[in-house]
Design a protein with these regions (language model features):
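Leucine/isoleucine-rich amphipathic helices and adjacent mixed helix/strand linkers
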Residues: 1-194
Length: 194
């Protein structure tokens, strides 16, 4: 309910690190509210976007069994994105071996190297952190991810044409750091200011 862009059942399974059968079972009886394509490589979509608002609003959704805690859902997705990227991202992810290769030269192979759930994670993980109200600190999971995978993440963003979003995301992270004098803050300043 809080995805920032639609994903397929396969991609959700990978992003959430859940068996595909669990996702299938969870959406099985939701045809009235979800467009569930026969081709499970196509994205799930809500028939009525207002239903999302209903599930996220405590006053409108009278049944706590259906109520979705939006902040908690964003926190979970943020860390699911980080876990997926930590597992998947690496140097020279598209196997080009030569710096300066154009995206047009790699073409459709970028989709093979960066499947939809990885592209989703790369683009939206910081927004999920922000919407989840997560405060950052030295040596937390976010700091450790960036220390190891910052360049891998930026490389992936460049392959999918989203590098400017990455630079903006890095700059915005600074306001979520708890302590004003921290190595995490210094790391982000060095990253953005050079």
């Amino acid at each position: 309910m809080v995805l920032l862009s639609p994903l397929s059942i396969f991609s959700l399974s990978s992003l959430l690190n859940l068996p595909k059968q669990d996702i299938d079972q969870a959406v099985e009886d939701l045809h009235a509210i979800l467009n569930i394509p026969e081709d499970q490589n196509h994205s799930l979509r809500l028939h009525h976007p207002s239903f999302r608002d209903f599930l996220l609003n405590k006053e409108r959704c009278g049944d706590s069994n259906f109520l979705v805690d939006e902040k908690q859902a964003h926190q979970t997705l943020a860390f699911d994105c980080i876990k997926l990227m930590s597992t998947f991202l690496k140097q020279d992810i598209c196997g080009q071996k030569a710096p300066g290769t154009l995206v047009t030269d790699v073409g459709i192979r970028v989709e093979n190297y960066l499947p939809p759930e990885v592209r989703y994670a790369c683009i939206y993980w910081v927004q999920h952190l922000q919407k989840g109200g997560i405060q950052l600190q030295d040596n937390d999971q976010v700091y450790q991810f960036l220390q190891v995978h910052l360049l891998h993440w930026l490389e992936a963003l460049s392959w999918i044409g989203k590098i400017s979003e990455g630079i903006i995301a890095i700059s915005s992270l600074e306001s979520y750091i708890l302590v004003s004098q921290s190595s995490f803050r210094e790391f982000l300043l060095i990253t953005t200011k050079g």
